[in-house]
Amino acid sequence: MDFAEVEIIKFFKCLNTNHVKYLLVGGFAVNIHGFNRSTSDLDIWLDDSVENRTPFVNALLEYGIEGAELFHTLPFIAGYTEISLNNGFCVDVMADLQFFKQREFNECYTIAKEFNITNDVTVRVLHINTLIKEKEQSLRPKDKIDAEQLKKLYKK
């Protein structure tokens, strides 16, 4: 799965149109930063504030997610709070990462980088140094490999 996938582009367009504060994390973020590996889902870290919940729900409604209203109160837990796009691709929604927690979201959001995935759609991606630190804290071997490969690419 890649960013050329129409449903992924449509999903990010809905997030951006509704001014949702999110960061792309996980395998797609690793790919954007230059280490290409396969990934089975799209991981997004959301600002879990009252002010961000309504735009997020509006984005889901615009995209066509049934039951989107539940996201007004549903906890954003990695591996638990998932959305299935129209193509069956899974979006994993989280309020906390392994290392970085919600209280650090705004700081991470401020230093994040925007990348164009099409001429008119951008995604906000966890900064490379933040992503490496996050991946280093994981217990999963593939995340450790991601961190090492990203360090090599950026000669950190």
Give the positions of each predicted feature:
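Compositionally biased terminal segments of proteins
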Residues: 1-156
